[in-house]
A protein has these predicted regions:
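Pepsin/retropepsin-fold aspartyl endopeptidases
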Residues: 1-418
Length: 418
């Protein structure tokens, strides 16, 4: 029906994947074939079903090229190549990008073609190494100890640090679910003898930039040893004194790129361990409560508040929770009534930005009907170019440390707390 089509279309345009999930479950039979296939492709991407996503995107483009328009065809084929890369087939990912760039050469704008060529080269480069190799017949699960350490010398906030051996040398890494990639600074990349490449990726923090890919021959964390581990080289302090003060905490980051290699992992705050497991975990939850951004693969949790729901980044790399300008937009009256106005700095790739915020003394929300309360929560009041304060914000390590155990199930796309 046109009603189901309109509702699904609004969700796709607004990146509302949980709402689209519910609409698709209820009304997919009454959707037009194009909207049904478009929805299926985006849901499979958002909920980490990559084989299904590749098939759905191919079917959508093959059958509905005229309907969806050239701009969407380019976006979907670009997403298809990314999906092949996620499935470990960088050769196919590169071939898809090359074919698309060849077709558009001379007809599309040069910036679009250049971006497709950059991605083609990235997949070519990644395809030269068999990434994330493990010993065959090794353990199904691996225990990785962590410690919580102050964010900086004068801070009461903490980060999760993991001891590692990077190319045989001791290296402290920050455990960061909010980082799409494993990240290392240029100085550390040289110190640990990573092999640099000329392939680049786009990175967004307090501003947009690019990082170069480098490969670590070997990384050991806890009982796990991985070979050919990709990192993105980012200059985090970029000459800014205030950033340099805190950039050391992020000079080597273990990100989602590595964590997504495992069907599930458990963060145990009583034992101070992360268990990375190759086993598929059964869950009592039928409906997912985490999703991924189609482009960046950052995990978002569905949170209930004020009679509604919203998706917020799960970010162990943020010492404290911050709520973004979308939260302020939706709950202005609550924030203005309970909050105290302030100016706050946020630090990330790109430097420091200063935001107009309201600070909430306490805030109670729900994760899958489980209530939790956070204290002293800043809400960004203004829309800025800073990606760290955009959308609904990020649940930081203060949220994770409320629980004894947090289980992230990458296969079923659930987060469960106890």
């Amino acid at each position: 029906s046109s009603t189901a089509d309109a509702a699904a279309g609004a969700c796709i345009n607004g990146s509302q994947w949980f709402r689209l999930y519910d609409i698709y479950e209820k009304d997919s039979a009454s959707m037009s074939p194009m909207i049904r296939r478009f929805s299926k492709a985006m849901l499979a991407t958002a909920f980490n079903r990559n084989e299904e996503a590749a098939e759905a995107i191919t079917t959508l483009v093959r059958n509905h090229q005229q309907e969806i328009g050239m701009g969407n065809v380019v976006s979907m084929l670009s997403l298809l190549s990314t999906t092949y890369s996620r499935l470990g087939d960088n050769t196919k990912a590169s071939a898809t990008m090359k074919s698309l760039a060849d077709q558009l050469e001379g007809s599309a704008d040069t910036a679009t073609v250049a971006e497709l060529r950059r991605k083609q080269h990235l997949y070519d480069t990644l395809g030269k190494s068999a990434l994330y190799q493990r010993d065959k017949g090794g353990n199904a699960s691996h225990t990785v100890p962590f410690s919580t350490v102050p964010f900086s010398a004068d801070s009461t906030q903490v980060l999760m640090h993991i001891g590692s051996r990077l190319n045989g040398q001791k290296c402290t890494m920050t455990f960061d679910t909010g980082a799409t990639y494993n990240v290392i600074t240029p100085k550390r990349a040289a110190k640990y003898r990573l092999t640099p490449t000329d392939a680049t990726i786009s990175v967004i923090g307090t501003k947009l930039g690019t990082g170069r890919i480098a490969i670590a021959k070997e990384l050991t964390i806890g009982t796990l040893t991985l070979r050919n581990v990709p990192f993105v080289i980012l200059d985090l302090d970029s000459g800014n004194e205030r950033v340099r003060h805190t950039a050391d905490a992020y000079s080597c980051i273990l990100g989602e790129s590595l964590l997504m290699q495992f069907p599930h992992y458990i963060i145990d705050f009583e034992k101070s361990t992360v268990t990375l497991s190759s086993d598929t975990l059964t869950t009592s939850r039928r409906r997912p409560n985490i999703c991924l951004t189609p482009s960046g693969r950052t995990p978002y949790a569905e949170i209930e508040y004020g009679g509604g729901t919203f998706a917020i980044t799960l970010d162990t790399g943020a010492a404290a929770t911050t709520l973004g300008n979308a939260f302020y937009r939706d709950y202005t009256a609550d924030v203005a009534r309970e909050g105290k106005w302030d100016i706050a700095a946020s630090t990330g790739f790109g430097g420091v930005t200063y935001d107009s915020i309201f600070r909430l003394p306490s805030l109670t929300m729900r994760l899958s009907s489980t209530p939790f309360t956070l204290r002293n929560v800043p809400v960004s009041a203004l829309s800025t170019s800073n990606a760290l304060s955009a959308n609904y914000g990020r649940l930081g390590l203060d949220f994770f440390r409320l629980w004894k155990k947090v289980t992230i199930n990458n296969a079923a796309m659930t987060i469960e707390v106890e």
